[in-house]
Regions:
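Glycine/charged-rich beta-loop-alpha catalytic/anionic-binding loops adjacent to active sites
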Residues: 70-75, 144-159, 190-197, 255-259, ...
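Phosphate/diphosphate-binding glycine-rich loops and adjacent basic-rich segments that engage nucleotide
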Residues: 529-625
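Cofactor-binding active-site loop characterized by glycine-rich and histidine/acidic residues
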Residues: 66, 70-227, 237-256, 534
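Acidic, glycine-rich active-site loops and adjacent beta-strand->loop/helix elements
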Residues: 106-111, 198-204, 214, 231-237, ...
Length: 756
């Protein structure tokens, strides 16, 4: 047999071999396990043809698991977490439409194969094999990761972080109704259902609990949510058992969520219960928790040795309940297939998969950094252009505030104006978060927006950042451009995986085919007077600095904020980008620059067509001493510049970075070309701050004759009251640092002065 080529010199992991051989042996003997549930094909209205199709998908999934381990032993495959024991989910791949977006668990092989049969031209077996061997021709990830995903099948790829996909599934469900209410074109049909599968152990994760809680919270407001949560309960999380009644007792009484239990070993029971779930979600638009009890075969993954935590008897007990044997028993008792026919189907599928595996291992893998990194940024699809709002529309929407547009305004007001203009321009833009509605946000940045655009486009969420960002991802899957708000920078850490693990990786793991554009607004940074402490004055953005493909913008003044926000929306809408927009809290209401009453930090609101391009820096002044800074640092540097010029006769050029990730390297190097001295003013902490990236850039790319110094925040949390001033850069410390740079005293390191 062809498989011998893989087996040569390889010892198959014992349990995979046992399960494989036992299936054939028991089928030939007609030795089938007793069903755990009473649902019959007749009662479930499951016909012969469909049942055999399910069996075929189950067999294919099982054999793919086995061959994945054989290939792994030869170094030809790289992933062995399989679907063995979960093959009952093949039924779900048929009951639900291929147009229903599915966020899948990593044990969804049979589901994927069965759904692939719904669309001509999709070879599910080949696609899975290409993914297993990390082939560059893998149609979903291009060999970047083993995922279940397909654009034609409406299956976005998911990460391996358990439960992390539940919040976006909820957001996608929300998007279906929201698109219909707003009369917007939708990628998903109005009667679509969102599917989200996961394991019993995942249900315990905080992210799952947050999503189920949010789901109940939304349904309590009688809002439609067509979603089916599919918990594939195999009774164990790697090595930790799940109490048999735990899932049911913890979920069945949740308000607003229908609980349906089914026997995942009985395809008739899954078929009947899945159709019930489909009706509740599709027709009644109500969320369902479908609890599918199954077993786990072959351990957690190929490297998992079950005997370390399970007895031989426990392992054999699970193997005796092989779902393939259960399905074979149903087919035999119904007279739909003979014993020999089932064996032949199994062996024919083995030959098919072996042949396709031989083809797959010959496929080239990615061979360069450029090729691998190509999908960090989504593919740019041609999008409908949205026109800027005309004067009549603006006058109508702004109403009483329209005449204020010509007045000089602060940062907070200019962001509000910009959001208003953008909401008029982009009908698929949604603003949401904690207190953004009637209250208008903690700092009134979103004041009056709900009155201007209604509760369907500007809405409050429950107080859970995981749900906020996850909802944004899900909405983006269906064509919306979400603009979620995180109330304070410190709160981002409650949900950073939704940004780091989910939103930022979708394009990468889908070869740029899927995108979840958004502009995530965060009230950020320190220097607030009379309010806060650390949790309202967090000055660390380290968590945002190393996210491939994510753009981080941070304005220092009103006009820049408006122009940059417009660019961020364009990047999200036209290029599918994920953008984080950091708004310096301390500058929201700032009016004066040099002295009380000078109104030096109030500016006219820029025309709606004015934008600042990504990577374009702000420049103020001239001189061979250059300050590189952003946000509050730019404001303080402007104050320091006046003193330096008037009291010390020192001319300073100040560069407002504006774009913190990726750093605007070309613009920086251009502006410092004639510089002799560089001062970096970074309000972030000394460790992990933007200053580190700037220092590296200057060391590697700038003139070795430059004198360089940085002043940063201390490696400390921000305290309550006024004590923060001892930790952060100030006007005085900037002045002192610039004066020190003028000295001829040099600490030399390769000819370069470095003072930190």
């Amino acid at each position: 047999m062809v498989i011998a080529q893989f087996k040569q010199g390889v010892v198959m992991l014992d349990r995979a071999s046992v399960v494989d051989e036992q299936f054939l042996k028991r089928v030939l003997q007609g030795d089938f396990p007793q069903l755990r549930s009473s649902m019959s094909p007749d009662t479930a209205e499951l016909d012969k043809k469909t049942a055999i199709e399910f069996f075929d998908s189950q067999i294919k999934s099982r054999l793919l698991d086995i061959i994945a381990r054989q290939l792994k032993e030869k170094g030809l495959s790289f992933y062995t977490i399989g679907s063995s024991g979960h093959e009952g989910n093949a039924v779900l791949g048929q009951v639900f439409r291929a147009s229903d977006m599915a966020f899948l668990h990593y044990r969804s092989g049979a589901f994927f194969l069965q759904r692939a049969k719904q669309l001509p031209g999709i070879d599910g077996v080949k696609d899975i094999l290409l993914s297993l061997v990390a082939a560059a021709s893998d149609p979903i990830s291009g060999g970047r990761h083993k995922v279940f995903g397909s654009v034609p099948l409406n299956i976005p790829p998911q990460t391996s972080t358990i439960a992390s996909h539940l919040p976006k599934a909820l957001g996608a469900a929300l998007s279906i109704t929201r698109a219909r209410e707003l009369g917007l074109p939708s990628k998903l049909t109005p009667d679509s259902v969102i599917l989200c599968s996961f394991g019993d152990a995942s249900t315990n994760h905080a992210t799952s609990q947050a999503t189920l809680n949010a789901c109940s919270w939304i349904t309590q407001q009688n809002y439609p949510l067509p979603i089916v949560f599919i918990c594939e309960d195999n009774g164990i999380g790697i090595s930790v058992p799940t109490p048999s009644s735990w899932i049911k007792s913890s979920v069945s009484s949740r308000p607003g969520i229908h609980y349906i239990e089914c026997d995942g070993l009985n395809i008739a029971d899954v078929f009947a219960k899945a159709q019930e779930a489909d009706y509740l979600a599709r027709v009644k638009k109500q969320p369902v928790f479908l609890h599918m009890r199954c077993v786990r075969l072959l351990g957690h993954a190929g490297s998992d040795i079950e005997s370390q935590y399970n007895t031989q008897e426990e392992i054999e007990q699970r193997e005796a309940n092989d779902p393939l044997l259960h399905t074979a028993g149903i087919l035999y008792r119904e007279g739909w297939m003979s014993l020999q026919a089932m064996v032949e189907l199994y062996q024919d599928n083995r030959a098919l998969i072996e042949a396709k595996a031989l083809e797959a291992i010959r496929e080239p893998r990615m061979s360069s950094a450029e090729e691998i990194m190509a999908s960090i940024v989504p593919r740019i699809d041609k999008k409908q252009k949205y026109s800027l709002p005309d004067d009549n529309r603006r006058a109508q929407v702004f109403a009483g505030a329209y005449n204020q547009l010509a007045l000089k305004r602060n940062l907070c007001q200019q962001i509000n104006f910009a959001l208003t203009d953008l909401m008029m321009q982009y009908p698929n833009m949604l603003i949401f978060g904690e207190d953004v509605g009637k209250k208008g946000g903690v700092y009134r940045v979103t004041a009056d927006l709900q009155a201007r655009f209604g509760q369907r486009r500007v809405f409050d969420t429950l107080l859970d950042e995981t749900t906020i960002i996850g909802t944004a991802i899900g909405l983006a899957h269906n064509g919306f451009i979400p603009v979620p708000e995180i109330q304070f920078l410190a709160y981002l850490h409650n949900a950073e995986d939704q940004l780091r693990g989910e939103a930022s990786t979708l394009s990468f793991f889908s070869s740029g085919q899927y995108q979840n554009p958004m502009v995530l607004r965060i009230a950020s940074l320190a220097y607030q007077k009379g309010f806060g402490g650390h949790f309202h004055n967090d000055n660390s953005i380290a968590v945002l600095r190393d996210l491939p493909g994510v753009i981080v913008a941070c304005p220092s003044n009103g006009p820049d904020a408006a122009k940059m926000l417009r660019t961020c929306m364009r990047l999200a809408y036209e290029e599918g980008r994920v953008v984080v927009f950091l708004e310096p809290i301390a500058l929201y209401m700032t009016k004066d620059l040099y002295s009380p009453g000078d109104n030096g930090w109030l500016f006219e609101y820029p025309s709606p067509d004015e934008m600042i391009s990504q990577g374009e820096v702000g420049v103020y002044g001239e001189g061979d001493t250059v300050i590189l800074t952003y946000a509050n640092g730019y404001y303080l540097s402007r104050q320091a510049e006046k003193v330096l010029r008037e009291a010390h006769n020192i001319s300073v050029k100040i560069i407002d970075l504006r774009w913190l990730s990726p750093l605007p390297k070309d613009a920086i190097l251009k502006e410092i070309a004639k510089a002799k001295r560089i001062l970096i003013v970074d309000e972030g902490r000394q460790s992990g701050s933007i200053s580190e990236g700037l220092m590296t850039l200057l060391m590697e790319e700038a003139s070795p004759r430059l004198k360089i110094k940085r002043i940063t925040g201390k490696d400390c949390f921000i305290p309550l009251g006024t004590a923060w001033q001892y930790l952060l850069p100030s006007q005085e410390s900037i002045i002192d640092a610039v004066i020190a740079l003028q000295s001829d005293k040099r600490e030399k390191e390769s000819g370069r002065l470095v003072v930190s």
